[in-house]
Structure formats: structure tokens, C-alpha cells
Amino acid sequence: MKHPGLLDLSELLRGLKPEVRPGSFVMVSTNSQSGLQALASVDEDEGTSMVLEQHKADAFRLEYSSVFAWITLTVHSSLDAVGLTAAVANTLASAGIPCNVLAGFYHDHLLVPRDRVDDAMAALSRLSASVPEDDVPPASLESF
């Protein structure tokens, strides 16, 4: 079954509908995945980077440097959509909020510092509300 998702940047931004996933999350790098159930992972030359629930990383005594909140952009974005990641990253960067983006088949997910999640949600809400209904992205997004 094909699930193409939205391609139009204006539609994507208007429909962001960010939601905070309950919990606290960390990113670790390990060469041993024994017993670990990552929520997301990337195999790199240096080891496997994994996103884990903080309590699971603590149980395995894994080192991490930051604790994140997980925000899901519930809009169904196409894997071929252009500009969504850039618009979101630019918005959060303008607010001084670090962001790590994970792209899923249906949705994009953001890891932001746990103590900045409210700021991130407010910035994303402003971004979504700033896109007029006539499909013209705000001037700040024209370069994307």
C-alpha cells in the first residue's frame, strides 16, 4: 500500500501539529547492542548511535551528554518533501534551540533539550500559524 504523504511545504507547515512524546530520551553510541531496544538507531563507523529512553540507558550504565524531549510532527510528510526539515531547523535555531531530526516513513521527529521543550513547541506553533492559507510560505521560508 502506498502512503505518499504531503509534498507541499505550505500544507506541511500549516499541518505540523507537533506532539510531545511522554518520557525523557538520550542518545548513546555503543559497540554492543546486547539487550538494548533502541527507539531509533544509525550504524556508524565509530559504533551504533541509539536513541533510548533515559531510564533504560541508566539501567545499562550507558554514558550520555544530554537529555531530550521527543516531539513528533504529526503531519504526514512525504519522503520526497522539500524544505520541511530546513524550515523547522531554522525556526528552532532562530530561538536558540538545538534540534536533532529523525525522519520516519510517516512523520518527522525532533529531539530537543528536555528543558527547552516548551520553547520548542511555542516556536513550532508560531511557525505553523505563520503560513497563510493562500499557499504562500512566509518570506523567511522563501530561501528553502
Q: How does the language model describe each region?
A:
Residues 1-91, 131, 138-144:
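Regulatory modules associated with amino-acid/nitrogen control
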Residues 29-31, 103, 114:
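Short, structured patches in soluble enzyme cores that scaffold and shape functional sites
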Residues 37-38, 96-101:
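A short linear hydrophobic-aromatic micro-motif
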Residues 53-57, 113-118:
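Helix N-cap motif at beta-to-alpha junctions
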Residues 64, 117-136:
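Charge-rich, low-aromatic oligomerization/scaffolding segments with amphipathic character
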Residues 69-71, 95-97, 108:
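Generic beta-strand structural signal
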Residues 91-97, 123-127:
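Generic non-transmembrane alpha-helical segments
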Residues 105-107, 111, 116, 134-136:
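Structural preference for solvent-exposed beta-strand-turn elements
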